[in-house]
Amino acid sequence: MQNLMDQIVGAITRSGLVEVEVSARHIHLSERDMQILFGDGASLTPKRDLSQPGQYLSEERVNLIGTKGRKEHVAILGPVRSSTQVELSKSDCVELGVTAPLRESGDVKGSGSIIVEGPCGTINLTEGVIIAQNHVHVPPETAQMLELKDKQRVCVEIMSERPIIFKNVLIRVHKNFTFRMHIDFDEANAAAVNGFTLGKIIK
């Protein structure tokens, strides 16, 4: 049975079809900011593994405060990073009164600002808020099969009841990646994504 499943998954992958995952608003914390928000010696408590190996949803939550509003119980994804990064949808930014650029994850220089509130402290994040560029995580063997390269831009057609073709989708290749496409809730709602959904990579 497992061999049959592997053959089916392989056939889907060779067709350039990728599972689409929807990312809600979340934050990645630096070790320093983690200690400020949750107290000295605090660490993240894994709650559920994510599709990308080594990444997880934590038990801990924070509040985000903008000039027009706040979002409570915002998810923290682990493990900790070298710098704090907040990923919001455009709708989130409008509701919070935050200005954030469309960026690749990790590119936070000159990005948006926000206040992050935890149970033990608050940080005024002067930069680090972005609207994440939609992207596809690709392991090297899949990249070779589909002739994809790291940093390449492609189009992806969302195979839903309201099909949409996203242009300028970023390809990210790494040996630790699982083959998945990530979009935010604004994009998912526009394409009527509901449950298991595939996207077709178009070069």
Where are these regions (language model features)?
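Short beta-strand-centered segments at strand-helix junctions
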Residues: E21, H26-T67, V74-P119, N124-K151, ...
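Short, low-complexity, charged amphipathic interaction modules
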Residues: M1-S15
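Short domain-boundary/entry signatures in modular proteins, especially
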Residues: T13-E19, K203
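Short coil-to-beta-strand transition motifs
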Residues: P163-I165
